[in-house]
Amino acid sequence: MAGILRLVVQWPPGRLQTVTKGVESLICTDWIRHKFTRSRIPEKVFQASPEDHEKYGGDPQNPHKLHIVTRIKSTRRRPYWEKDIIKMLGLEKAHTPQVHKNIPSVNAKLKVVKHLIRIKPLKLPQGLPAEENMSNTCLKSTGELVVQWHLKPVEQKAHES
């Protein structure tokens, strides 16, 4: 570049314009990584509407307590803050369900990565299992948590005759 500028200074003024046009074509900015910026999406987009409840099901008066969250898309070529949230939610491995509470702090994180995940409500047809029954539970692909009850052996009473 210094050699080109030295030639420009030595040349007559008429040739200066043709050389500067050639220098502009040499400068290419395609290799520069442009900075990611957060999208400025208005908050009203994230507010629930009655049409959403009709479309996706659910009752706004009695919301479910737990979410089943599954990552369905890759985090490659995604911004760093989306990768951080995926790691916070424990969704590094794809198609592995994670259970999260339905609270505002968790929901705010889920909104940021909602295009990468699938969210289903956790249905408890037999109610919330006790601590001793947690090892006997099975999570179905439909989103139901089924408690597998084990039969206890009946004690035989001795008959005296």
From Swiss-Prot:
MF terms (GO), sorted A to Z: structural constituent of ribosome
UniProt keywords, alphabetically: Mitochondrion, Ribonucleoprotein, Ribosomal protein, Transit peptide
Transit peptide segment: 1-34
A Pfam family per the record: Ribosomal_L30
CC annotations in GO: mitochondrial inner membrane; mitochondrial large ribosomal subunit; mitochondrion
Cited Gene3D superfamilies: Ribosomal protein L30, ferredoxin-like fold domain
Family listed: Belongs to the universal ribosomal protein uL30 family.
UniProt GO BP: mitochondrial translation
Subunit structure: Component of the mitochondrial large ribosomal subunit (mt-LSU). Mature mammalian 55S mitochondrial ribosomes consist of a small (28S) and a large (39S) subunit. The 28S small subunit contains a 12S ribosomal RNA (12S mt-rRNA) and 30 different proteins. The 39S large subunit contains a 16S rRNA (16S mt-rRNA), a copy of mitochondrial valine transfer RNA (mt-tRNA(Val)), which plays an integral structural role, and 52 different proteins.
Protein name, UniProt field: Large ribosomal subunit protein uL30m
Places the protein is found: Mitochondrion
